[in-house]
């Protein structure tokens, strides 16, 4: 997606260097608009979506398999190369990791930037939000040019949702549209894995249980969750 739209005004969180068409009337397809005093991702046939890290759903307990993939590291710095809706990054930040989220899709970046600012200004979530750094860039390009050192890199290549809630399926479907269906074992995701492994000693890749390792690259070990697994690469 190369054209971006907003209703009435340009969102303050929208990436500065990206053009955004400001419209007076509701367009077809996706656009950003004010909804309940916050910017939301809207579409003519869908309910508005926004990201809210202050929601108790982000802070509730339960079995957490992802943090186990980052145990026994020398440091706490993680690069999330596929930020998306930010759920995994928020979970890791809640567990004390310093997370850099990288997102190249301007709509998603806008929602994430707004959510992080809101969380920083909310007492219950301020400390966790301070653990997050948001970057608007292609992840491969960022990893090749940044001087920042990371202790681990996390990848979540999209797959069609299975055995998930209606809301998760809806948000996954929207990600597929926004990111031009670049999911699964595409050349782009394989290049991202290669770049990540060259850049960092630990790389964690989220996979469906039924899927082979990304690019058939065998991990050192796996963390099994009910519907997914986390492949851990070390060197």
UniProtKB/Swiss-Prot annotation:
It comes from Dichelobacter nodosus (strain VCS1703A). It catalyses: guanosine(1516) in 16S rRNA + S-adenosyl-L-methionine = N(2)-methylguanosine(1516) in 16S rRNA + S-adenosyl-L-homocysteine + H(+). Specifically methylates the guanosine in position 1516 of 16S rRNA. GO terms for cellular component: cytoplasm. Its main location: cytoplasm. Keywords: Cytoplasm, Methyltransferase, rRNA processing, S-adenosyl-L-methionine, Transferase. Its EC number is 2.1.1.242. It is found in: Cytoplasm. Pfam families: SAM_MT. InterPro entries: 16SrRNA_methylTrfase_J (IPR007536), SAM-dependent_MTases_sf (IPR029063). S-adenosyl-L-methionine binds at residues 87-88, 103-104, 156. Belongs to the methyltransferase superfamily. RsmJ family. This is Ribosomal RNA small subunit methyltransferase J. It is an enzyme of class 2 (transferase). GO terms for molecular function: rRNA (guanine-N2-)-methyltransferase activity.
């Amino acid at each position: 997606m190369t054209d971006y739209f907003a209703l009435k005004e340009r969102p303050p969180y929208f990436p500065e260097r990206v053009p955004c068409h400001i419209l007076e009337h509701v367009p077809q397809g996706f656009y950003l608009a004010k909804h309940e005093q916050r910017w939301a991702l809207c579409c003519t046939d869908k309910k508005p979506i926004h990201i809210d890290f202050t929601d108790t759903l982000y802070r509730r307990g339960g079995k957490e398999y992802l943090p186990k993939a980052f145990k026994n590291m020398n440091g706490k710095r993680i690069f999330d190369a596929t930020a998306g809706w930010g759920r995994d990054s928020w979970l890791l930040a809640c567990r004390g990791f310093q997370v850099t989220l990288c997102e190249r899709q301007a709509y998603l970046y806008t929602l994430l930037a707004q959510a992080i600012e809101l969380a920083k200004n909310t007492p219950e979530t301020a400390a966790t939000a301070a653990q997050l750094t948001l970057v608007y860039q292609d992840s491969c390009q960022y990893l090749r040019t940044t001087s920042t050192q990371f202790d681990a890199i996390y990848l979540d290549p999209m797959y069609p949702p299975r055995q998930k809630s209606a809301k998760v399926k809806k948000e996954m479907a929207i990600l597929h549209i926004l990111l031009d269906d670049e999911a699964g074992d595409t050349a782009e995701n394989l290049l991202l894995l290669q770049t990540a492994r060259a850049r960092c000693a630990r790389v964690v890749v989220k996979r469906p249980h039924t899927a082979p390792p990304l690019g058939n690259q065998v991990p050192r070990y796996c963390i099994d969750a009910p519907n997914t697994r986390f492949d851990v690469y070390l060197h």
